[in-house]
Amino acid sequence: MITCYLRYTIDPYQLEAFERYSRMILPLAAEYGGVHHGAFLPHEGPNNIAVHLFSFPSLAEYERYRTAVREDEVAKAAWRLAEETRCILSFERSFMRPMFANEP
């Protein structure tokens, strides 16, 4: 399993727009074979950092998701919203291997 850690730098004055974007994007991972662990929005600390975490069985499955989502109408609408509102200033994508307490 791989987990994608997607760190956004957002416009804090467009937080509501970013929340709308997130609500549109969140269900898509599950529709294409992954698990979305949620959107994590600013609360304490920097007011311009948000994170999405989602997992796929493999990097190959994630790449299939990336290909499929490019044609998804909900994803296209979310990206348009982000572009029009400029709620996302930049983002960084990292891939991690989860480790759980009950695993050797």
Language-model regions, residue ranges each:
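Short, structured motif recognition centered on aromatic/hydrophobic residues
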Residues: I2-R7, F18, A29, A50-L53
